[in-house]
Amino acid sequence: MTSFDSSPQFNVWRTLLALAIVLVMLATSGWTAARHQRGDTNPLQRALNAWSDGRFQGKALPDADAPSAKLAGFFASLSRAQRLDLAERYPLAVGNMNGAPPKLRYRANRIALEEAVVVERERVRDHRLSTEGRQEADRRMHRFLSLLHPKRHVLAFDPTGRGRVAEVFGNLNRAARVSVVVPGIDTDVLTYERTYRTFSAPAGMAKSLYKAERAQREGSLPRSASGAPRVAVIAWADYTSPAGIGVDAVTAKRAEDGAVRLSDLVRSLPGKKSVALYCHSYGSVVCGVSARDLPSRVTDIAVAGSPGMRAANAAQLGTGARIWAMRDQDDWIGQIPNLELAGVGHGTDPVSAEFGARVLSANGAAGHAGYFEPGTESLDNFARIGVGAYQTLRCAAGTNSCYHDAEDVVSA
């Protein structure tokens, strides 16, 4: 969230200027110039091509884009040794394959990360690159090494371009409820986690939410037979977010691409567990676009610091999930005009009365990047949604009915 962490007033004016620039671009050059993206071959695509051309035990491998249920059936038909063999042959493909067992994806992505470390280490030593290029390679190498820590569970990894990653906190197979954190702009492998302002980065957000959900569950319910609270949280930085405040940040293209990926992830989660989405900033645009196509297992969509959800009101999202919204009083995004004109802007403010969301307190969040900070009412509310303890939610000031028809569903 690099751009959204800087001076509020500066960002407000820069966003308004960006809106004007986009309109000029669309009028003079059309969508093509604004949306042009490099189409170079990339590591993940090469891996998928190899999978497509590969054979296993004399038979063609299933389409990597097949429905997750079909892929799950394929992997279930194999022995453990056969599954590991495929992960070692095609680590990037298997590691990003919805339908593959989570533990197999973790294993495949460890192999892919190890290979990516080798690539970046060679780039660090390549003096044909600029100093800046070698420094970036060094940062990427250390990020990949961090993700290789034995206790980390990487569900998706793509080193292409700015990079994408998704990580699981908790036991995804045993969890009764799963929370998915969907971050906003400037999210990539380098900004995925931070030492400074830890809880403004996807990894920090998800880890903070996981700890808060465990605390909520431990404080209100008996533990499960295993002795551990049955929740899991996914830090989902597995879409290409807008880079900075510009054309992509004020239009829906990145959100539309991300929405497909988000829906695929949710459908592929093992078992029949319920899912809650936590959508921050531009991530709320992704969640808004995806809402209509999400499966019914998604029971809650909570947005924080939202520029809009590409809908005039909550009903227009077309989902049966409960829609929650919050915004800290010091969040600069509240100063951005909520509009949608010629595809620019993201529509009605989700915390406004006319939108019709259930508005929650965000006390203590202290601006745009603080919603997942420990000790805030925003994080406490997120955690209560995550464990299904709706009757203990704290509504926004001036309201007392945000949870009036939401029954607690927490179970051991």
Question: How would you name each of these model-derived features?
Answer:
Residues 179-181, 235, 278:
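Soluble periplasmic/extracytoplasmic beta-strand elements of cell-envelope proteins
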Residues 172, 184-264, 268-273, 293-412:
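Lipolytic serine-hydrolase domain surface
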Residues 51, 236-239, 282:
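Aromatic side chains
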Residues 1-198, 393-395, 399-402, 406-412:
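Flexible, membrane-associating and regulatory peripheral segments of lipid-active enzymes
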Residues 288-292:
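Short, hydrophobic alpha-helix immediately C-terminal to the catalytic nucleophile
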Residues 177-179, 274-276, 300:
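Structural motif
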Residues 157, 182, 280, 304-305:
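Short His-Asn-centered micro-motif
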Residues 278-287:
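Gly/Ala-rich beta-loop-alpha elbow adjacent to hydrolase catalytic centers
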